[in-house]
């Protein structure tokens, strides 16, 4: 595997996330319904758009991503973002799965007022993303400000017929989480649910 510096890997991962999750048309590629992009076409279109991208760089990003954001097709000819899509081109068909008793959602404290009103919604993405552990949720929440960890009563939701799916990188997905299925134990005292 070729050597790349951390900035180059991070920049490429962000570029791939943008193109493979949100705006494939920004460089002129089309994703299939399962989110797959032809690697040769991706590289060519990225280079035409001024982005330095090679197969070796892709291989390194896919292999070293701590969150396993991307995967290759079994024949190695296509790549996709594992989850997190907002583009209408993609509708990955995940297998429904029974969740553990609790899952976790990391968010920034500035979003809590809205969450208290409407629960967790997918927003521009196709699903609400949940973590199996608090540490991962804390990292996610810290990306947007002072992190707050919300506990989701996942098994209770599933017992009421609300479906869950799990992406191949371990991220749990659901359509929405109503306020009644949220626990707020890690909130600052001034932000406690009324």
UniProtKB/Swiss-Prot annotation:
Q: Which Gene3D superfamilies match?
A: 3.20.170.30, RNA 2'-phosphotransferase, Tpt1/KptA family, N-terminal domain
Q: Which GO terms describe its biological process?
A: tRNA splicing, via endonucleolytic cleavage and ligation
Coiled coil location: none
Enzyme category, top tier:
transferase
Recorded hits in InterPro entries, A to Z, give: Ptrans_KptA/Tpt1, RNA_2'-PTrans_C, RNA_2'-PTrans_KptA, RNA_2'-PTrans_N
The UniProt entry's sequence similarity note says: Belongs to the KptA/TPT1 family.
Please state the Enzyme Commission number of this protein: 2.7.1.-
Which GO molecular function terms does the record list? NAD+ poly-ADP-ribosyltransferase activity; tRNA 2'-phosphotransferase activity
| Name the record gives this protein | Probable RNA 2'-phosphotransferase
